[in-house]
């Protein structure tokens, strides 16, 4: 399942490599976030086997992944969903390796995260899944036997997600739009289920440059602040103690973002508005957000 917005060239590369998998996906779903570059037409012409979900307005990555996971689970009755961005270019064995790790682990596994590298083979720092820290010896042994290690959160760049976990713990929160939607979703799911990082399942995250943890968010700092506050206020992704630790880490990161920003005025504005909206509001229901984008969720969500 791929979410796209106005990156038809990268999307074409992504879909071409999905076709080239040694173990091809049974079904491919693309959520087109109201692209204006002809993405849907290109898919219909070059990849007629793909199920295209075209939204009438851009719902952001959060809305796109919510709609795509629902489509895969409800319409196609998937057992496992491989979710990714449109600038994710999988290596030929990526899916086979994800499935091998999932099968080797056994019951209780909610998701498997890929190793994400840049075009030169170096790891993308922002896409290295976080270790749970307090994982038990048994969990670490099970992850090691499956060729990986335990994780607490991961990114939507490339995730294999068990459908039962999606049904049980819910879809991503669509109202996040961008930033922290994958952080919240995977943390919520992995508060209850298990997750592992599978380093043999390699994908290329074809960004313009190698990412760093000190990315300058600019105006998107609003989404970073508001959404992080929403995550910690909701209480579904983290318990009180873990949330306290994460809040401290977030504040340290915000200070670093600000220090390295090229537009600190925009950062200050984004922080003030994000703080205000994060404390005064809560996310709208995913059903409401997707309905505005032209996608109707099934009643059970």
Put a short name on every predicted segment.
Residues 131-152:
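Short, flexible, basic/aromatic active-site loop/helix in glycosyltransferases
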Residues 7-20:
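Short, well-formed alpha-helical segments that are part of the catalytic scaffolds
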Residues 153, 158-170, 175-202:
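A short, conserved alpha-helix in the catalytic core of glycosyltransferases
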Residues 93-126:
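Conserved donor NDP-sugar-binding/catalytic core segment of glycosyltransferases
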């Amino acid at each position: 399942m791929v979410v796209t917005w106005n990156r038809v060239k990268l999307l074409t590369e992504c879909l071409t490599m999905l076709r080239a998998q040694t173990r091809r996906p049974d079904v491919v779903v693309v959520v087109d976030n109201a692209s204006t570059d002809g993405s849907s037409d290109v898919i219909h012409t070059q990849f007629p086997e793909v199920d295209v979900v075209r939204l009438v307005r851009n719902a952001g990555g959060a809305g796109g992944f919510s709609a795509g996971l629902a489509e895969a689970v409800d319409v196609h009755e998937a057992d496992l969903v491989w979710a990714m961005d449109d600038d994710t270019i999988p290596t030929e064995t990526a899916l086979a390796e994800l499935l091998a790790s999932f099968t080797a682990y056994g019951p209780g596994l909610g998701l498997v995260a890929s190793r994400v590298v840049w075009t030169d083979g170096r790891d993308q720092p922002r896409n290295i899944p976080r270790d749970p820290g307090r994982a038990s010896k048994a969990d670490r042994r099970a992850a090691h036997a499956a060729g990986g290690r335990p994780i607490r959160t991961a990114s939507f760049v490339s995730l294999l997600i068990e459908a039962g976990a999606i049904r049980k713990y819910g879809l991503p929160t669509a109202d996040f739009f961008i930033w922290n939607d994958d952080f919240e979703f995977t943390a919520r799911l992995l508060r209850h289920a298990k997750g592992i990082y599978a380093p043999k399942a390699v994908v290329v995250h074809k960004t313009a440059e190698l990412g760093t943890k000190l990315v300058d968010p600019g105006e998107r700092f609003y989404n970073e602040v508001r959404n992080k506050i929403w995550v910690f206020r909701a209480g579904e992704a983290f318990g009180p103690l873990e949330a306290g630790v994460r809040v401290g880490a977030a504040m340290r990161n915000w200070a670093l973002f600000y220090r390295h920003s090229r537009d600190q005025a925009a950062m200050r504005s984004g922080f003030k508005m994000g703080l205000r909206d994060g404390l005064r509001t809560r996310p709208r229901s995913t059903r409401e957000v997707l309905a505005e984008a032209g996608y109707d969720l099934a009643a059970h969500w």
